[in-house]
Each structure stands twice: as C-alpha cells, then as structure tokens.
C-alpha cells in the first residue's frame, strides 16, 4: 500500500471465512451493484428496498403461503393467502381492505403449504390433503373442498407440493413412511367439479402417475419452469417435459434423458425459481451445504462460497432453510433464510455476489433473519408476509424504513453495514492518517416543520459510524459518528482522522437511517513503516 491519498478496495459482497485475517467482509442490507460505462466506479453499495404495510387487516395467525392467481372474479387476478387453517382472497389491497374468507378449513398442520392454480381452481397441498377453491367464485361463495385422490399401491396419497404445467396440476406423494418417488398428474383444465388425478373410467380409481426414472429418491420438490418439470429428491433431480400426447390424458409427459444429476436438496423449502433459474440448498450422497443454480437443461452450478458453506454447516437446522427468489431493478435475487440462526443470505445473479439481509428487534436490539416471506407481484406492488401479526407488507424503494421484528410495524430505520476487505502491505505496519467515505450526501428527506408555518429548512442529520480493526477483524475500536449531510448539503465530506494502525487493517461502516442512499467507495491517506 503506497503512501498518499488513494482509493482502496471497499465495495463487495459478504465473504467471511474462519480465518478473519484473510477476509472479514460482510455486506448487510446493501446490494453490490454494477454501474454503467464511464461511471466513477465499477461497483457501488446500493440500498436494499424499504418496507411498508400494504394492508392494515390482521389475521392474527402466521402466514403459510401467498399466491397471485392467474384469474379471479371478472377475469381479474387476485391475491390469495393461507393463514393458520383459513384461506383468504384479496381482489384489491389497501389500508382498510378486509379480504374475503373461504368457508371450510385446512385441517392439517401449521407449516408451509404449496399453492398453484390452473386458471379454474386454486389448489393447496398441505402434506396431507389437496384442497381446491373456485378462482372465480364471488366473495360470499368461496368454499374449500378436498380432492378425492386415488391410492398408489394401496396407500393414500399425501401431497406436499403442487405445480401447474401444460393445463394440468401435478402433485407429489409425501406419505410418511412410504417415501415414494412418484408424481401424479390431473386431467386437463379441471374445475372444482371435474378435477381428477385418476385414469378415467377405472374402478376403484387408478392413479395417473409417473415414477422418477433416474433415482429411487422420494420426490420432495416439484418446480414448473419454462415448460419443464424439475423433480427434486434428497439426493438427485431429474427433468420432465410435456410430450407429444400432452393434450390427451394417456401419456402427457416425457422424461428428459441426460438432464439429471446426483445433486438433490437437503431443504425442500429452499427450492425457488426465477426466470430460467432454479435454486436450492443441495444435498447428495457425497456432501451437503452447497447452494446450486440450475439454468434450463444445463448441469447445476455451485454458487455458494466456501465461507458460506462453512456457516451453513454450523447450523443445526439447515434442513429447515427457506428459499425464495424475486427480481428488482435489474437484479435477480435468491434469498435463503435460516430462521433459527437469525441468518438470511442473498445471491445476486447479475454480480454473482452474496450479501446479507437482516431485520432488527428494536426492543432487544438484536438483528435476526430478514422477515419477508412468500413474495408476489400483485396490484402493481411487490407484496410479502413478514409481520408478527399477519399483515401483508410491500418492498419499496420509496422509503428506508423496515419492519420492527418486535412490533410488526414498518416504522424503524434500516440498519446497514459494510465490513471491507483486509488492507495490508506485505505485513508492514500501516498507519491510517485520514479516511473518507465516497458516498451520496445531502439527500435526507425534508421533515415537517417543528412549528406550524415555519419555513426554515428542516431535515434530519444522518450519521455514519466507523469501526476499525488493525488485526484483521479480531478486535475493534469505535470511532465517533460523522454526519453525511442534511438535505441539500451535497458537498458534505464524510471523513475521520488518525484512525489507527495495523498490519491487517479493516474498516466497518454502519448506518441506521430511514431513507435510501448509496456508497461508492473509500479513500485513505496512509503511511507505511518497516516490519
């Protein structure tokens, strides 16, 4: 590291192996984002979206799934949600909107359920029963009913996953103890009155099903993506596709030979998709804890890092990991949450970098896993469930506020953090005389005047907190807060002097503000001395 003022590496993703002196990097509630041609830097830290409450109605029960249907009353798509044992439908959403409730109850379990629709019925698989409701029924006529499923080999079918492809619904069989590697398919365009998974005319009803061809793995996940069915077990996956007879009831699907691998999933709820990408937390006879991305018919690509896999291995509940994917401003994100460990890690397809997201309990001051679950795009909003009282919220770039994990209210500032890479110079002693943050300043929103009629500019005074480590991140020294500019103060500089010394120098910046801002880099003035 030469002397004088220089730009040093700072922006990046999370990568923190056990040996901290190698790298202690963490990026929390920031997204490393590529810039355009001739920009001042190639990569910046952009803010993750804020959160706001989209509907004040409270279910009082945990959400088990959300789904944006293909149609509804008057041909308009709707939002559906399963909360506890009840199913609700929103034809619009807003502050004081109350959803319509289906008659009947989902009587099995309290965990996640799987939802799909075929344009006629909404289908819900809860691990025991397949439930359906008419998509187009009026609010007062919404009624749940159970589908009579045929037995397979003399035992009842217990579906935990449902998907839709080629005008058919497809389900697995998660009957405990059976461990069956079969999936059943329905008739074409089944309604609440006609939906069937049995061969027409058979008595007793004989199931329409296929057995997995590549492995005897029980089927734990089914993903319909780009006209293909991805069938995933604990130690393998394979791909099926609609065949020449997909418009008849005889033999609608073909196994895609060669599109298989001995990589399955150790966490069925981690399976997620976006565009042509399918993700999951992988498991096989050879090992566990790697995250894979599969695109089309290609072989799966490991996208997790060694540091992340070590972190996953430390979890005692990795099999309960939850995954979902969503797109935002040119990014495609795969989010993987380990609730018991208070951890959410996010892979960005555009940069191939990982970052972290967290939500804070402002009563205890503890940061935990990111709250959002079950994201859907509906009503022109990116909706999700993530409150403690069952309210629907949305992700938005209009605010930097986030949901308080203690109260469920979206009224707290986002807590953002970046721990940069280790700065070192062949083990020489490095003394940092001055440190400046290259960041967006002066964009603090205007506040309401403290005195009515007062026209004096009034805005909050946002601050950045600096911590430094001279030993690679093992011990830290807190330095004072610095302002990064009231509203309109675009020339504000954010810098510290006499920041300390070390042979492995690490910088950590923290922010707790309720508006979005961007960080571009770090400049330091440093001196070197001999070993």
Where are these regions (language model features)?
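Beta-sheet repeat architectures centered on beta-propellers
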Residues: 1-99, 104-120, 262-277, 283-531
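Acidic/proline-rich low-complexity IDRs
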Residues: 6, 42-44, 121, 134, ...
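Generic detector of low-complexity/intrinsically disordered segments
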Residues: 45-47, 81, 89, 132, ...
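Beta-propeller and closely related beta-pinwheel folds
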Residues: 52-66, 96-110, 141-321
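Short beta-strand segments and strand-loop junctions that repeat across beta-rich extracellular domains
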Residues: 86-93, 131-137, 180-202, 242, ...
């Amino acid at each position: 590291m030469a002397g004088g003022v220089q730009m040093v590496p700072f922006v990046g993703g999370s990568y923190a192996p056990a040996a901290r002196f190698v790298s202690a990097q963490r990026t929390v509630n920031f997204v490393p984002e590529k810039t355009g041609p001739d920009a001042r830097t190639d990569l910046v830290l952009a803010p993750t979206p804020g959160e706001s409450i989209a509907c004040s109605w409270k279910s009082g029960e945990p959400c088990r799934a959300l789904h944006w249907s293909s149609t509804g009353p008057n041909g308009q798509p709707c939002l559906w949600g399963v909360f506890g044992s009840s199913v609700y439908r929103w034809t619009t959403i807003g502050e004081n909107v109350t959803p319509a409730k289906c008659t009947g109850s989902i009587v099995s379990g309290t965990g996640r359920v799987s939802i799909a629709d075929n344009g006629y019925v909404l289908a819900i698989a809860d691990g025991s029963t397949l439930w359906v409701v008419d998509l187009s029924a009026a609010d007062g006529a919404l009624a749940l009913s159970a589908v009579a499923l045929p037995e397979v080999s003399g035992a009842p079918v217990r579906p935990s996953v449902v998907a839709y492809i080629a005008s058919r619904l497809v389900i697995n069989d998660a009957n405990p103890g059976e461990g069956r590697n079969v999936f059943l398919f329905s008739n074409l365009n089944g309604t609440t009155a006609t939906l069937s998974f049995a061969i027409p005319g058979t008595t007793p009803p004989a199931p329409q099903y296929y057995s997995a061809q590549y492995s005897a793995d029980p089927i734990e996940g089914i993903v319909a993506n780009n006209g293909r069915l991805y069938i995933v077990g604990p130690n393998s996956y394979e791909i099926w596709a609609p065949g020449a007879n997909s418009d008849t009831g005889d033999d609608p699907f073909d196994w895609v030979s060669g599109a298989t691998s001995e990589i399955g999933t150790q966490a069925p709820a981690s399976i997620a998709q976006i565009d042509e990408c399918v993700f999951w937390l992988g498991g096989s006879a050879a090992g566990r804890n790697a995250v894979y991305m599969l695109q089309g018919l290609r072989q799966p690509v490991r996208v997790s890092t060694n540091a992340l896999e070590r972190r996953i291995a430390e979890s005692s509940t990795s099999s309960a990991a939850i995954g979902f994917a969503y797109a935002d401003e040119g990014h495609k994100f795969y989010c993987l949450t380990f609730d018991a460990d208070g951890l959410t890690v996010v892979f960005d397809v555009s940069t191939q970098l990982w970052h972290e997201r967290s939500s804070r309990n402002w009563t205890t001051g503890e940061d935990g896993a990111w709250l959002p679950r079950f994201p859907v795009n509906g009503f022109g909003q990116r909706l999700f469930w993530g409150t403690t009282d069952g309210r629907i919220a949305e992700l938005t770039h209009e605010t930097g506020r986030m949901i308080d994990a203690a109260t469920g209210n979206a009224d707290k500032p986002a807590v953002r953090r970046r721990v940069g890479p280790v700065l070192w110079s062949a083990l020489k002693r490095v003394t940092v005389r001055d440190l400046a943050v290259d960041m967006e300043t002066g964009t603090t929103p205007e506040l309401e005047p403290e005195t009515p009629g007062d026209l004096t500019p009034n805005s909050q005074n946002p601050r950045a907190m600096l911590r430094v480590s001279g030993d690679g991140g093992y011990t830290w020294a807190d330095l004072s807060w610095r302002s990064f500019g009231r509203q309109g103060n675009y020339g504000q500089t954010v810098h510290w002097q006499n920041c300390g010394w070390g042979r492995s120098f690490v910088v950590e910046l923290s922010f707790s503000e309720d508006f979005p801002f961007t960080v571009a880099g770090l400049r330091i003035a440093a001196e070197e001395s001999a070993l």
